[in-house]
Structures are given as C-alpha cells and as structure tokens.
Amino acid sequence: MTKVLFLCTANSARSLMAEAIFRQFAGDDFEVASAGTEPTKPEPGALAALEHLGVETDGLHSKALADIDLNSFDYVISLCDRARTECQALCGDQHFIAWDFPDPVTSKKADAFKKTAHELSERIKMLLLILRKKSDRPQLFDAPHEFFKIMADPLRLKMILMLQHHGELCVCQF
C-alpha cells in the first residue's frame, strides 16, 4: 500500500487539512498521515473549512515530525517553504514533493481557510489521479530516460536542444 505524508510547520492547518482531504478521497487505497516540525493544536478555522467541504474531521490531531519514521513513507509532501527546507534532506528514497501554500493562519482574508482547503482538494485530486495511474502501470515514467524513450526522434532531439540552450525548462514558459 502506498503511504503519503504531508508536512508543514505547525501541523495545525495546511498539512492537517491535506491529510483529511486525502484520506476522504483516497479511501482504503492509500495510507496517509501528516506532521509538523513544531506542532501546535488544530486551528478551528481549518476544521471548519474541512466540515464546509464535507470532509470528516474526527480523530484529526497534530503530530510531531520527530515521532514519525520518514523512511516508512513512499511520498513526502511539504506544504510550506520552511518544512521543505528542514525536511527535504531527511528524506531518503521517497519521492519528495514541495507544494508551497500560503499559511491561512496568518492571512487577513476571511475565507483563507476555505480557499486553502479548496486548493488542497484540487491538487490532491490530481495527485491521486497520477498515483492511481502509476499503480496501474508502475514502470510508467519512473525516470526521465523512460519518458524520452517514448518520444519520436525529432521531438526528442528538439527537447534536448532546448534544454541545452535554456538549461532549464518549465511548461509555464511556453
């Protein structure tokens, strides 16, 4: 079973919401947890935003990263720059993914928690789609060379030339 861990600093809003949303959408197909580098109690606004989305909040509580074995997770997803900086080096063979979401706790906007919960739910839906497809075809794009193997020669050559010229490419630039 694939195991996913969501991280942020306090484990009181973003990562806690991500854990609950992922659990609801994934069902029994995945195991999910969340933790914080400096955990505090769950934010009432986060719990209210989850309930607004119809996501179950029973049993949600903040957990310390120190109490979790990072090596037991297949995917570790940080939800803030600080957690990414502190935790990326600690991750061994797992896939480390960095999602930077603004902290709704420090936001002045009235709907910050609802907006964050909605954005997390959309991102998690996409992640689950990818993870489920990958489990159907586990060898699909595990490494860049696998991706290049399926390209036609002219496209492969064009991509290599673009990489050489630009050094780094992002789809948002095209």
Could you say what each language-model-derived stretch is?
Residues 1-66:
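Conserved active-site segments centered on acidic
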Residues 136-140:
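Long, low-complexity, charged/polar intrinsically disordered regions in eukaryotic proteins
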Residues 70-72:
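Alpha-helix C-terminal capping/helix-to-coil transition sites in glycosyltransferase folds
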Residues 84-135:
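Phosphate-binding/catalytic loops
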Residues 142-174:
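N-terminal helix-turn-helix DNA-binding core of bacterial DNA-binding proteins
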Residues 12, 81-84:
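Short glycine-rich anion-binding loops that position phosphate/pyrophosphate groups of nucleotides
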